[in-house]
Amino acid sequence: MEVSEERDLYLHSITAALERLNSAASECQSRLLSEHDGSIEDHSANQTAHDNLVQEAYKFLQIAQGPIDTVATCFERTAHVACARSLLEMGAFEGLPIGGESRSTKELAEDLSVDEALLARLMRNSALFEETGPNQYRHTPFSEAYLRPEIRAMFRFAMDEHMPAHLKMHEFLKSNSWTEPTSTSNNPYTYAHDTNGKSMWEYLSERPTRMASFNDGMTLQAMTELWMIDLFPWESLSDQQPTPTTVVAVDIGGGTGMGISRIRSYCCSLPGKFILQDQAHVIQSADPRGNGIEKMAYDFFEEQPIRGALTYLIRRCLHNWPQESIIQILKNVAAAMQPEKSRLLIEEIIVPDMNAGIEEGWMDMIMMNLGAKQRTLKEWEEVLALAGFEVRKIYQIPGNCHGLLEVWLK
């Protein structure tokens, strides 16, 4: 290709990408400036506009950089996260004052008892702090995010557990004859961490500090995705005429209770019981809010003790497991359900058949580390059928990858 042709192609590509970026930015700005009613549809429209803007920004940056520089960004991105993880461990984020005041690396290094030259290099190359003078830094909103406990935990978990698995993924897949990993004990994570045949869950259970990072980080996900509970018309359960002894909802693997508390608030006029189930160490710290909510230690690989509930829920759990394990979990629920009375609600990402978004993509690679996966609707229907279920309704906002599957016994 001639130089002039290459230049013209680049100019055309970057102009078109800029137009798409400006359009996405205008739509996002319009959503931000409009009045909001707090509905699920409103929330989803805001999120979709934001996601589209981010995606177009990524595309624009890729075109602006060109193919070779885009490949080279792997050095830049890994350097940034390496700096951030080191600064987190060092305690540098807490060492800077909040409120816009800057501080020298000399003062900060003395407080932290670290080498100033090392600290200065890490802060300079982290792309997080504002440089106000030679070796003078202050917080930005991006660095202050690391002061939030749930953000710190999520980042630590990503870097310490999944980054090694990502970097060793090609080695594992080659040793696995380039086939999809489907085992909890033989996957990129167990390979990278040399777990000696233990799954990530078993391995982390022996390392409480690292398991705590996972649990604390998941509270962020639980808070940001609570809105999916709102997709189901909870008031419709009154049609089944529950009594004070009826179990209205069982939240299986429901964590600390935010989900079941929200469900109870939507069913405030209904009598009956609401059950929060999770492993014993999680249930101990659970604090659900609402009348009639009971806590129960339970492992979903065991027989489900609550029989004939109106609604069972499994929220954001099944994607962590390979198909064989999912079928076992689902069959335990199925055995407890009463035909044409009990339903199971499954809250998960539903990967679109085409043009999957950023979140679905990186989440699927996280799951590959564990021998699990994110699934399309067809794939969910297939695995559910193997456990004796059929999908009767899908609750999903257009443009959003998260959905709620309402499934019944076949």
Curated annotation (Swiss-Prot):
Q: List keywords of the entry alphabetically.
A: Methyltransferase, S-adenosyl-L-methionine, Transferase
Please name the GO terms of the biological process aspect recorded for this protein, alphabetically: methylation; secondary metabolite biosynthetic process
Q: What happens when the gene is disrupted?
A: Fails to produce aflavarin.
Q: Which Gene3D superfamilies match?
A: Vaccinia Virus protein VP39, Winged helix-like DNA-binding domain superfamily/Winged helix DNA-binding domain
Q: What induces it?
A: Expression is induced by the developmental and secondary metabolism regulator veA.
Q: Its domain of life?
A: Eukaryota
Which molecular-function annotation in GO is an example for this chain?
Answer: O-methyltransferase activity
Protein name stated in the entry: O-methyltransferase afvC
Query: What's the encoding gene here?
Result: afvC
